[in-house]
């Protein structure tokens, strides 16, 4: 209720009290000729009581409405508190993930990379780069070098396989030549024996 409504209610209460006292006095003492009619005072009292009842009903409705609004605000506050706790939990979880990530031994630290100084000698255009960009450039250069070496390795492996195949073919040819030579030598033994006998 507003302050004006409360003030009006208090005024009505005061006038109601006055009317009640007036009725009480009339019952206690005999009426004078100029006194008001008790029925008229009762009607005034009833009208004041109706005003008070209406004020009471309005104040009750306002109380119910205030309780509803308070419950809604409390619910919103509880939901906001729950959301805040969820955000704090997420924040803590993300901090833990970041901490674990920062403490983790990264694979690039175990790679035998070229030093920053050597890289900058070969690539002076990266001298003004920050550490992150410089590391990315070193890793990219390392990747290109490894891809080049991998391609070279594949070519050498193909060449090795071709040489092995060629050597195998030549070895087979030599073995066949040896076999033919052995066969020839074996077949020439009787001829040699014949010439040895005839030459004696």
UniProtKB/Swiss-Prot annotation:
Consequence of gene disruption: Results in increased levels of H/ACA box and C/D box snoRNAs.
Primary localisation category: cytoplasm
UniProt keyword annotation of tRNA-binding present: no
Keyword Nucleotide-binding appears in the UniProt entry: no
Subcellular location: Cytoplasm; Nucleus
InterPro entries: THO_Thoc5 (IPR019163)
Domain of life: Eukaryota
One GO BP: mRNA processing
Keywords of the record: Cytoplasm, mRNA processing, mRNA splicing, mRNA transport, Nucleus, Transport
Gene Ontology terms: cellular component: cytosol; nucleus; THO complex part of transcription export complex
Pfam families, sorted: FmiP_Thoc5 (PF09766)
Oligomer status and interactors: Component of the THO and TREX complexes.
Family: Belongs to the THOC5 family.
Function: Component the THO subcomplex of the TREX complex, which operates in coupling transcription elongation to mRNA export. The THO complex is recruited to transcribed genes and moves along the gene with the elongating polymerase during transcription. THO is important for stabilizing nascent RNA in the RNA polymerase II elongation complex by preventing formation of DNA:RNA hybrids behind the elongating polymerase. The THO complex is also required to maintain TRAMP complex occupancy at sites of snoRNA transcription thus promoting exosome-mediated degradation of snoRNA precursors.
Protein name in UniProt: THO complex subunit tho5
Source organism: Schizosaccharomyces pombe (strain 972 / ATCC 24843) (Fission yeast)
């Amino acid at each position: 209720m507003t302050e004006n409504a409360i003030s009006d209610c208090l005024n009505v209460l005061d006038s109601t009290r006055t009317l009640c006292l007036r009725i009480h006095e009339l019952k206690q003492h005999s009426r004078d000729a100029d006194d008001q009619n008790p029925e008229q005072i009762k009607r005034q009292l009833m009208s004041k009581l109706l005003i008070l009842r209406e004020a009471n009903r309005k104040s009750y409705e306002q109380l119910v409405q205030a309780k509803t609004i308070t419950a809604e605000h409390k619910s919103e506050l509880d939901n906001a508190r729950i959301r805040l706790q969820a955000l704090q939990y997420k924040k803590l979880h993300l901090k833990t993930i970041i901490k674990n990530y920062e403490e983790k031994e990264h694979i690039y630290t175990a790679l035998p990379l070229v030093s920053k100084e050597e890289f900058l000698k070969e690539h002076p255009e990266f001298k003004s780069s920050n550490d992150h960009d410089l590391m990315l450039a070193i890793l990219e250069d390392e990747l290109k070098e490894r891809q080049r070496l991998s391609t070279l390795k594949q070519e050498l492996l193909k060449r090795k396989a071709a040489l092995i195949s060629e050597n195998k073919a030549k070895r087979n040819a030599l073995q066949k030549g040896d076999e033919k030579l052995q066969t020839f030598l074996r077949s020439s033994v009787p001829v040699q024996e014949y010439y040895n006998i005839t030459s004696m």
